[in-house]
Design a protein with these regions (language model features):
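A conserved beta-turn-beta hairpin within the catalytic core of GNAT-like acetyltransferases
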Residues: 52-56, 109
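Acidic, metal-coordinating catalytic segment for phosphate/diphosphate chemistry
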Residues: 2-35, 39
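Conserved acetyl-CoA binding element of GNAT-fold acetyltransferases
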Residues: 56-63
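Unchanged
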Residues: 65-89, 97-154
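Charged phosphate-binding loop/patch that engages nucleotide di/tri-phosphates or the phosphate backbone
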Residues: 153-172
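Entry beta-strands of beta-propeller and related beta-repeat scaffolds
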Residues: 42-43
Length: 172
């Protein structure tokens, strides 16, 4: 790392260094996620029990892009794979984020896009989540209100999800 004050050199932040290291090693992962709201404005989250370092956390349905797949197609495919629902339309992209995370036992730079979608069915059920997703680490799923997201002490990704949803809906 460069010393401060040397002309033409910039000290890298920890995130910048990790990002550069992941990119140099070809460990870039593209991903798409869906913020799915029910008629009552609750958001669907899946709980993953990954063990260290990610631990137990809640996140929106989604995952990595397949080769030659675009973000929107990946978002819809992942939603269908994780819920069994293929009748959901995306309303639009609401956020992009970059993060360093462990995936498949290695450090990766993940670039993901988050899409907003709605279902018109209240309390829509996911069938067979235990059998279908145990191998993927999905331990549970539930619909959360924004107030529950604000109050929870559990880990929810992305951080600030309730505010992201409020902003997307113009309720900020």
């Amino acid at each position: 790392m460069a010393r401060a004050g040397r002309p033409g050199r910039v000290a890298l932040s920890c995130f910048s260094w990790l990002k550069a290291a992941a990119a140099r090693r070809g460990r870039l992962r593209l991903a798409a996620r869906v913020i799915l709201l029910d008629p009552d404005g609750r958001v669907l989250l899946m709980r993953y029990d990954d063990g260290p370092p990610n631990g137990s956390h809640w996140t929106t349905p989604g995952g990595g892009l397949n080769e030659a797949e675009d973000y929107r197609a990946a978002a819809l495919r992942e939603l269908a794979e994780e819920t069994g629902w293929s009748d959901i339309a995306l309303l639009g992209e609401v956020a992009r984020r970059r993060l360093i995370m462990e995936y498949g036992g290695r450090l990766v730079l993940q670039r993901e896009r988050l899409y907003l979608a709605r279902t018109d069915q209240a309390c829509r059920e996911i069938r067979g989540v235990d059998a279908m997703h145990a191998a993927d680490g999905i331990a549970a799923w539930r619909w959360w209100t924004l107030a529950e997201l604000d109050a929870t002490r559990e880990t929810v990704w992305p951080a600030g999800l309730a505010d992201l949803i409020r902003n997307a809906l113009g309720q900020a």
